[in-house]
Amino acid sequence: MSQEDLEIDLDAIQRRMDGAMHALRTEFGSLRTGRASASILEPIHVDAYGQQTPLNQLGTINVPEPRMVVINVWDKGMISKVERAIRDSGIGINPVVDGPIIRLPIPELNEERRKELTKVAAHYAEQARVAIRNVRRDGMDQIKKAKAAGMAEDDQKMWSDEVQALTDKAIAAVDKALEEKQKEIMQV
């Protein structure tokens, strides 16, 4: 195995760690923080036209005020299905139908709910850390295989240090993202 092969693998390791970070940001985006955001609707799918369709493909989602999300559903026959999907989603928001528009007033979070959300955010962050550590383990396994195939001890140490540096950087990014999200959640 040549060093070029390992460099390609380092790029793959970096991409997989970035993927874990992207997944974490997506999870964080779905947490309701008391502020209006279109991202809280991303996980919602509506039974439309015989299949589960993402809500953002059925209408325009706007945030006109800090505590209000407005959905302008394109097909007026879908309004009741969109409303039902939002109610059944468990995000804790009651939609208000106003003609062709659905308004979602975002209620203020109480202290207990804020603490629950910080725990959920910490759980998501831990899942991302585990995913990153699994990528690190896979990278270290590749290095061990390369050593068995004749890689020099110094090269093995260098590549191991690089994989560890990528891991440390990714874990630090997760910790920073978690700290920011918890601060956002606890902000009144």
UniProtKB/Swiss-Prot annotation:
Highest taxon above the source species: Bacteria
Coiled-coil segments: none
GO biological process terms on file: cytoplasmic translational termination
Gene3D superfamilies xref list: 3.30.1360.40, Ribosome-recycling factor (1.10.132.20)
GO molecular function terms listed in the Swiss-Prot or TrEMBL record: ribosomal large subunit binding
Pfam families for this protein: RRF
Entry keywords, A to Z: Cytoplasm, Protein biosynthesis
Main localization, broad class: cytoplasm
One annotated Gene Ontology cellular component of this protein: cytosol
SUPFAM superfamilies given in the database record: Ribosome recycling factor, RRF
Annotated compartments: Cytoplasm
Family: Belongs to the RRF family.
PANTHER family in the cross-refs: MITOCHONDRIAL RIBOSOME RECYCLING FACTOR PSEUDO 1, RIBOSOME RECYCLING FACTOR
Function, as annotated: Responsible for the release of ribosomes from messenger RNA at the termination of protein biosynthesis. May increase the efficiency of translation by recycling ribosomes from one round of translation to another.
Entry protein name: Ribosome-recycling factor
Lineage: Bacteria, Pseudomonadati, Pseudomonadota, Alphaproteobacteria, Rhodobacterales
Gene field: frr
